[in-house]
Amino acid sequence: MRPGGALLALLASLLLLLLLRLLWCPADAPGRARILVEESREATHGTPAALRTLRSPATAVPRATNSTYLNEKSLHLTEKCKNLQYGIESFSNKTKGYSENDYLQIITDIQSCPWKRQAEEYANFRAKLASCCDAVQNFVVSQNNTPVGTNMSYEVESKKEIPIKKNIFHMFPVSQPFVDYPYNQCAVVGNGGILNKSLCGTEIDKSDFVFRCNLPPTTGDVSKDVGSKTNLVTINPSIITLKYGNLKEKKALFLEDIATYGEAFFLLPAFSFRANTGTSFKVYYTLEESKARQKVLFFHPKYLKDLALFWRTKGVTAYRLSTGLMITSVAVELCKNVKLYGFWPFSKTVEDIPVSHHYYDNKLPKHGFHQMPKEYSQILQLHMKGILKLQFSKCEVA
């Protein structure tokens, strides 16, 4: 063969190899990652399906240039976060076979995903809530939605009714009292021990409206972690009975304790159980007699029934919704932006540090973890979809 012909043949071979490489690598890389995920799902028989999805293999990242590498890394993170959302949705309906450590790994993965509010997701979810429940009009009992003569059914003891006579009717506000609705930024503050040393107090207090649950402490050293601002706080009637002696001999202590809440609304489930009614009314009359700055509101039992039905369609089948999920649902309807603090159903942090059940006591949760609360998995989904934001760890302090 002539020397020139050999050189041409060599160049042709090199061009062919280069062409094959260009055709093979870019087009195949994403598909290859998907195949690996599917193969992993089929081959990993000992791992629950949702966790296999969340642990799908990483795509090999080409390092031709810094910009290419960063773009590929960003795309991989996006794909990982989409898989994560799918995994959360799948385990929300099936919790057997998962350990607490599995869930903490999922939380760790969630924290690696950048959070961004998704206006369309928020609007769609809020519209569904409003269609079923309408917190804006029906969240609390008012003179507008409950006229004199109404036979009101209890939320849980639904076969029992209470007639709304004038002496009860005058306890209700004329209309819904949330005059600045919709609020721009709302904080729903749970009581989880994860708030200890979080330094979230300043951030919470900057919110336009702050919801709290069951008269938690907000003064002293804890304020740097939980804030002190309160616009609405729920009261479980049992705390009135157990801590404040049904407002008989400990009425003065109750009035002293509630002074820290300023002009907040006190929200009670007066019409959930018949046993709650008298105690809730006692709180109303105690505040009225003492000319306290706080105002008493009552959960509307029909709103709570409708809300329970709404969440039941999403797999939450508990005997009764937690106060935290009730208030979170209300906040989504009343607020444009919702952030949750102190929601943590685990016995330890992702760093394996024990967490007390409440931020104001040293009691640890019962040993062992049987299943992740269905409610919390729903809240995680709302976080992943950009409908609300969960604060998992310490807050950033300027």
UniProtKB/Swiss-Prot annotation:
The chain crosses the membrane at residues 4-24. InterPro entries: Glyco_trans_29, Glycosyltr_29_Sialyltrsf, GT29-like_sf, Sialyl_trans. One of its GO terms (cellular component) is Golgi membrane. The active site is at 370 (proton donor/acceptor). Substrate binds at residues 214, 236-238, 322-324. Glycans are attached at residues 66, 93, 151, 196. Belongs to the glycosyltransferase 29 family. This is Alpha-2,8-sialyltransferase 8F. Pathway: Protein modification; protein glycosylation.
